[in-house]
Amino acid sequence: MYSLMKKIITEKDIKRQVSLVELLLNHSQITVNELAEVVNTTERTIFSDLQTIKTQLPKGWLINSDQSGIQLKNEQNLLTNELWEIFLTQSISVQLLKELLTIKEVATPTFLARNGLSYETLNRHVKKLNQQLVVYELQIEQNRHRLSFSGEEETIRLFYHRLLMPFTHNNYFFEDYSIHESHYFRFLKRLRQAELAVDTEEVFGICWFFINTIRIKAGCRIPTSLFSTQDQLFLLYAPELEKLYRTEGVYLKDKEAAFAFSCFLDSWNYNNSYPPMILDILHRHSAETNIREFVNRLSESLAIKELEQTNLPENLILLLLKYYESPLLIEQTTKQYHYYLKEYEQEYPELYPHKFALLQQVKESTSMVKKVTNETYFFYLLSLLIQQTLLAVQPYQATIYFIFQGEPSWKAFLQQELNAYLGKRVILEPIELSQLSDITIKKNDLLVSNIPIDTPPMPVIYLSTIPTKNELDRLSDLSLRSYL
């Protein structure tokens, strides 16, 4: 959750301590050895860092340790942001980014005086920070007079959105966030009254509203339009968005209005429940015919007729509307989801020609404001939406054949419990040993038995008549390939 924030912390000790606090928050109990392994340091360093953290904890927080491990306790149900206020404010890079959000340029002498730094020390921190920002096509420009961002304004805002989203809804960084939040909830209420409401990620949308108003007030304007102001969806929502931004004294015009709408659209959920008016606009999208044909081809190729009755066409149209390439989004998608999507591609290699054909049609479309230039990124997003739909209509992924000799009532009970234990992606099918040779084996199929089987045709997991915890854990581990 805090991976981007940890990347931009330039002090090694603070970054390590923030990682430790995060681990302690996420685990009810954890050992020093486990902490050292995750943070990639020595146990001695962990002990030293824990002592430093203990001395800085706010009132109501404490660290307990015993033979079982270490616990971070909160005795008064306090907000975790109290911890971030202490540790993140010690980072020079975090403080610099915080100031550059609200102002176009930071006066170097003022920043040095406020943080008790020499120019040489600041220079070292900026160089380290720029090494992390370069992959996002951002840099901090620095001289003895001023500090400022170098990069596209859209990229700067997206970077801040992803950086701050885990923190801002609990008022970290800015105490007036709750005011923006109340304005945004009234905006959503007006949409419901006008029958324009859709399912959205509320924190996602509020954080966009928050950042956009701050950047506009700082005089940092969007230079290009990311969305057509003639689009029917834009024309529907623009009046309410203009009202929303006026609550913060911001008057949306042209490019800023288009960007504000694209940010609101960014918060829309897939598998949405659209009002009739919105659904009608989506179905009149210029790519709708190509997308319908694409879904029909998938349905025929996989012999899954139900695909045609799913939300996949609307999801793909929303993907095209929301589509935006940035180094930050591309890095997050390709690195975080790489393994899972690689498994998916191996499972459905026959779908690639259909996806490639759709991509070519999309690239040739004159209605696409945001063009597809990174094909890998587009395919990753496309694959996630297709796979989610496939698993919704056909959750079954593997069969576990169950050969069991024992008292029939116990066998029936055990079969029922194993079925529930394995979940709906796995089919537990009881068979007799004599039927094994007649089975058509598919990928991921397993055999579970409490008797020895000579030359089994598939992997076997042996269970005791009354299965042990270790046996069940092994069965669960092997069957989890059918899940995320």
What do these predicted ranges mean?
Residues Y2-L484:
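A cross-family "folded-core" feature that marks the main globular domain of proteins
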